[in-house]
């Protein structure tokens, strides 16, 4: 076991796959000589050369389209968005090409493409660089969507994403790159379509992902001190949602709290609520509750930025409120 930062875990995953497979390449702004905006591709340029770690102009639509073409002609490109918000400029390529080509070609084309990079709220990057685009991409047919949350799952998930023959959008939170964790030195892979049970419990199911996983963990001491026993699930796969694993938990706890950084309107939580109500309505003792970011552009001011995101104290209050309301009905 070795303790490494999350950005190093992502770099190690990329390095290992590039060493094993000469078709794996990295494309994006400053991924080469500079080593990536958060150093995920540091030193890969000197090891693999200009053609496999390709610096591009500031033209997301162009290099994303180039990567899609490379994927259908035999390469396994990894596109790094310097900030995931920039990929709005490549939305046409991602939606009309990456998401659809395997279907519209009748299966004649595979599209082994990873689109990854930093996103989420933090570091006072302002409204345009702090968007939560998970739900935007969730609506595109043909994409798989993953959100890593620890060095361990970041490495295992990225290696699996690189080897997948379908396009994978891989979200990394800007505030988690310096998170440290011990990970195995031997090679490992993690499934792209499964949740992670962070904590087993019996009172309530808390569904979360990315940075909010850590806010939920921060809320646990206060909840445990007062005798609450929550089950915590990191979704990891945002598309497809692992409704089978979620069902196991809901059938045990009968109560659900969703904690997300995505905005409330048409967010990941909204789709979760729809599927839980569709498949598990009879298992619920109370309506599903979601804690989401406010439906406003992210402020630049640090205090205001923080106020738009769900905090551990809000999670504690919501868990207590849900469980208390159910007990009141029962008694």
UniProtKB/Swiss-Prot annotation:
Subcellular location as annotated: Plastid, Chloroplast
One term of GO molecular function: pyruvate dehydrogenase (acetyl-transferring) activity
Class of enzymatic activity (EC top level): oxidoreductase
Binding sites annotated in the UniProt record for thiamine diphosphate: 60
Transmembrane segments: none
Main location: plastid
Binding site for K(+): 113, 161-162, 164, 166
Catalytic activity: N(6)-[(R)-lipoyl]-L-lysyl-[protein] + pyruvate + H(+) = N(6)-[(R)-S(8)-acetyldihydrolipoyl]-L-lysyl-[protein] + CO2
CDD domains: TPP_PYR_E1-PDHc-beta_like
This enzyme's EC code(s): 1.2.4.1
Domain of life, source organism: Eukaryota
One Gene Ontology cellular component: chloroplast
UniProt keyword annotations, A-Z: Chloroplast, Metal-binding, Oxidoreductase, Plastid, Potassium, Pyruvate, Thiamine pyrophosphate
Subunit architecture: Heterodimer of an alpha and a beta chain.
Role of this protein: The pyruvate dehydrogenase complex catalyzes the overall conversion of pyruvate to acetyl-CoA and CO(2). It contains multiple copies of three enzymatic components: pyruvate dehydrogenase (E1), dihydrolipoamide acetyltransferase (E2) and lipoamide dehydrogenase (E3).
PANTHER family according to UniProt: PYRUVATE DEHYDROGENASE E1 COMPONENT BETA SUBUNIT, PYRUVATE DEHYDROGENASE E1 COMPONENT SUBUNIT BETA
Name of protein: Pyruvate dehydrogenase E1 component subunit beta
Lineage, top ranks: Eukaryota, Rhodophyta, Bangiophyceae, Bangiales, Bangiaceae
Gene name linked to the record: pdhB
């Amino acid at each position: 076991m070795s303790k490494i930062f999350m950005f190093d875990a992502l770099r190690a995953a990329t390095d290992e796959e590039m060493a094993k497979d000469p078709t794996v390449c990295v494309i994006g702004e400053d991924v080469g000589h500079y080593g990536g905006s958060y150093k995920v591709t540091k030193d890969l340029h000197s090891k693999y050369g200009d053609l496999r770690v390709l610096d591009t102009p500031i033209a997301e639509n162009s290099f994303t389209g180039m990567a899609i073409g490379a994927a259908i002609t035999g390469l396994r490109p990894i596109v790094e968005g310097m900030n995931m918000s920039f990929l709005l400029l490549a939305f046409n390529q991602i939606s009309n090409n990456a998401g659809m080509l395997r279907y519209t070609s009748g299966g004649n084309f595979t599209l082994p493409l990873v689109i990854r990079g930093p996103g989420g709220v933090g570091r006072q990057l302002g409204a345009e660089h702090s968007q939560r685009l998970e739900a935007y991409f969730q609506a595109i047919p043909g994409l798989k969507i993953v959100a890593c949350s620890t060095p361990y799952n970041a490495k295992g998930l990225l290696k699996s994403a690189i080897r997948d023959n379908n396009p994978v959008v891989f979200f990394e939170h800007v505030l988690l790159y310096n998170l440290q964790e011990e990970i195995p030195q031997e090679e490992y892979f993690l499934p792209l379509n499964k949740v992670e049970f962070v904590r087993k419990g019996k009172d309530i199911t808390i569904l979360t992902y990315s940075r909010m996983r850590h806010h939920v963990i921060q809320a646990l001491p206060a909840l445990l001190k007062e005798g609450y026993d929550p089950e915590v699930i990191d979704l990891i796969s945002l598309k497809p949602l692992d409704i089978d694993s979620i069902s196991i938990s809901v059938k045990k706890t009968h109560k659900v709290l969703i904690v997300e950084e995505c905005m409330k309107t048409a967010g990941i939580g909204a789709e979760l609520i729809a599927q839980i109500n569709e498949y598990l309505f009879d298992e619920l003792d109370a309506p599903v509750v979601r804690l989401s970011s406010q439906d406003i552009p992210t402020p630049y001011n640090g205090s205001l930025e923080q106020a738009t995101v769900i905090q551990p104290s809000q999670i504690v209050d919501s868990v207590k409120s849900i469980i208390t309301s159910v007990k009141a009905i029962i008694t």
